[in-house]
Amino acid sequence: MMQDPPVVLDEVVVTAPRLPAAEGEAAFSVIRLDGATLDRATRLDEALGQVPAVGLFRRTSSLTANPTTQGLSLRAIAPTGAGRALVTLDGVPLNDPFGGWVIWAQVPPEGLSGVDVVRAGGTGPYGAGALTGSVLLRERDTDGAWTAAIGERGSARLAGSGTGDLGPLRWVATAGLERTDGHVPVRPPDAGAADRPLDLEAGSASLRLDLPMGGALLSARGAVFQERRGSGVEGSDAEASGTALSLTATRQPDTGQPGWRVQIWRRTSDLQNRFVATAPDRSSTSLANHQFHTPATAWGLNAAWRTKRDGLETELGVDARRAEGETNERYRFMGGEFTRSRQAGGETSVAGVYAEASATRGPWLMAGGLRLDHWSTRDGLRVERDLQSDALVLDDRPSDRSGEVVSARLGVRRALSPEWSARAAAYSAFRPATLNELHRPFRVGNDITEANAALVPEQLTGIEVGVARETGQLDLRATLFANRIEDAIVNVTIGQGPGVFPRAGFVPAGGVLRERQNAGTIEAVGLELEVEARPREGLTLRTALSATDARVDGGSQAPQLTGLRPAQAPIWSATASVDWTPAPDWTVSADARWESRRFDDDLNSRVLDPALTVSARAERRLSPDLAAWVEAVNLFDADVETAETGTGVVSFGPPRTVWIGLSRRW
């Protein structure tokens, strides 16, 4: 599953609408998930979860997570649900234009050939948003795969991807459907008549057409997705949908010939959310907010020029993105109807230029890069009206703001022997606030979080050192790192319910009022270990560990947070897996994930207990390309705490779920 990116370029696939991995990436922390790992995954974020400390904001996968908490972070230092990692598919960002989260249902694993997880490593060629790193998805170029499976609680999944030729065109098509009746997250004795299952219906489809043009390749891709899900209580649900279009022209680098890429893309998204207030005994709910229309659109352009000569590889590039969107809501439910409306949104943009270079001299690899970005937020507004009289309640139009950010990175790697290597790196990165953070308040149960149009970009600096050993039977990697986030965007508690507060309005008993703020800094030091052993033919053992001690320094902005841990950031996390082929047609595998306790709030008052989950799978090959399998997720039915309210009501992750299915790979 894990390996360093090769220093020597892989064999060039002429149908790929992407440049090959840059040689300089080997100087940074990169984990590669291969096709075998993706073959066993039903959801991409679950496959990424095999890497310690990588995951969504809460201890939930995208199977049960609200769209707004599906943002990804690659180290346990992110203080909110906004994604701190940039996720791209062949160069096109998948992060939502409005909120920065990722709707993972839009990317069935069957449509991918591999994934590179770049932990930290700086903004580099990736662009804004790569604060804790980047996830680089590679779409399938050849062959195909499909999966059909059914599971407990009305679960079913059908997904497939294929390729073929149509005259001079090469096509790649992928589609997926998934549903589940879900589980009830709150359990007795806390559960009441208002608690409901986290049901889900999701679908996606994409088509890519590749046209060779001399030594270059022109690729056009279109995609659509939609998901509907319950939120666990009566009257609360969410629906997310979107489209993506991209056009990419690529020329692969060759001996003595430069390579280049020019890409334009457009994404649209919409989100609907219904939020409720829950009675103290959870016997009933009342509507609190209806986010009925959240249209957002993003456009992007990027280009790169890469050359290689005499062991020196260089890349020059530009990257520009623009997003606009707004939320339309009804709130303040009184007398059986909503009494107020809200329109809030604006526009953000970022544009940058960068230069990257790497040089190989004997056992040494040296890599570095410099980047300059201009960011801006403009045309912001938050307008609230009384629905009966149409009178203005709030008309807030914050001033336009902009700035520049310089990012840099430097890495070195030395081969100490045919098996051992050592590396060191220093880097910086930044993430501008999303439209969601700037302009949209939100509600979860009785807790309310206010927006803040004055947020400035988060900036991360870091250093790390690492060693690696690679042999035919044992791979070992170890990394020590220190990261610091300046102007960290934190949901800061500023009030307790019951009470009426400016802008936010009424906060019920047991609820809290928070506001997004640039609350000082987060400093983290950590250790990452990964081991993969192949003691004999047909047996592979893997284990990995992450230890991250992250602490907040709230400074004068939020002194009450100083010394505390970021919300939902455990110190310890570990994974282990075994793949065994006891007979030619049989494969047995098991995976375990453990993490220490974490906190569900900024004040570290809501404690979520440590969690250990184990999953197991047995697969029987029926033919060279067809297999039947059975899998038990959360085999021992562990209680995994995912959230806690101000009154102590705990939500849990899914119980044991057994799946059976057929998979074909060709």
Outline where the language-model segments fall.
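N-terminal periplasmic "start-of-domain" segments of outer-membrane beta-barrel proteins
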Residues: 10-41, 66-71
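Extracytoplasmic beta-strand/coil segments of soluble accessory domains associated
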Residues: 45-92, 96
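Periplasmic-side early beta-strands and strand-to-turn transitions of outer-membrane beta-barrels
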Residues: 123-124, 136, 142-145, 149, ...
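Outer membrane beta-barrel strand-and-loop segments of large Gram-negative receptors
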Residues: 292-305, 346-354, 450-456, 462, ...
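Gram-negative outer-membrane beta-barrel transporters
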Residues: 360-366, 374, 481-485, 506-601, ...
